[in-house]
């Protein structure tokens, strides 16, 4: 399941970070890894932006990230 498919407030574990479209380059995937989006890492999708759109507020540990939909679609998760 993609991070974008999780309901607001749901917790999950990162399974895989991979390019979801040709627009995604290796630099973005590397950056997501540097931010902590790594396999096995627990996270929580807190909420979406206005109208259920961007950005997605994602909590990893004690750090809150605001991700664009394109970035969030690169993160495959296992719901808890």
Language model features with spans:
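Compact, glycine-rich, soluble single-domain proteins
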Residues: 1-80
């Amino acid at each position: 399941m993609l991070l974008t498919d999780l309901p607001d407030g749901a917790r999950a574990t990162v399974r895989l970070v991979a390019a979801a479209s040709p627009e995604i380059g290796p630099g973005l995937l590397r950056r997501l890894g540097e931010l902590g989006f790594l396999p096995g890492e627990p996270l929580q999708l807190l909420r979406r932006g206005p109208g259920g759109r961007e950005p997605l507020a994602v909590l990893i540990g004690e750090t809150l990230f605001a991700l664009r939909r394109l970035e969030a679609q690169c993160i495959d998760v296992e719901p808890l």
